[in-house]
């Protein structure tokens, strides 16, 4: 209920000031957090079935899918209004990655890094994306850079990843 109220408040503010990119950014964040909250409740609830056929149980227990489309649309607007704001690209990349659009997420992380070369979180996330996209060398380079910029967890990921290769 509070999420919906916050989204409505941001929507009203956008009607009054449609050229403020931060209103779109905040509405996007609120929408994404609302989806994550609802999803976490859904995913923690175990549905019990008496069906003995595993395929039917799998179909009956399949998770709902949630769309970040509205949140991404808000970030598209924020980027259009404030094209030099690295966090808008970063946030959009996060939502694109969660939606499975890895190449598009990679592009947005790259843009965020070009706007803010010390953006450690963007290097970290882009590195993870590159590992998923099977570009191990570049992924490891980005994770290393994230570590240099202060995300020590990046070194742990590199160690675990290296141990998988051996």
Residue ranges and their predicted role:
Residues 1-166:
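Alpha-helical tetratricopeptide repeat
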């Amino acid at each position: 209920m509070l999420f919906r109220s916050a989204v409505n408040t941001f929507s009203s503010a956008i009607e009054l000031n449609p050229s403020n990119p931060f209103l779109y950014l905040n509405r996007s964040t609120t929408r994404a957090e609302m989806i994550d909250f609802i999803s976490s409740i859904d995913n923690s609830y175990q549905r019990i079935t008496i069906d003995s056929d595993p395929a039917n149980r799998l179909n009956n227990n399949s998770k709902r899918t949630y769309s970040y489309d509205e949140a991404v649309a808000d970030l598209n607007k924020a980027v259009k209004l404030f094209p030099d704001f690295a966090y808008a690209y970063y946030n959009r990349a996060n939502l694109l990655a969660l939606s499975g659009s890895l190449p598009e997420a990679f592009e947005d992380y790259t843009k965020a890094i070009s706007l803010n070369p010390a953006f450690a979180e963007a290097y970290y996330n882009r590195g993870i994306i590159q590992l998923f996209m099977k570009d191990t060398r570049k992924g490891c380079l980005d994770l290393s850079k994230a570590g240099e910029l202060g995300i020590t967890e990046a070194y742990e990921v590199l160690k675990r990843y290296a141990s998988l290769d051996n």
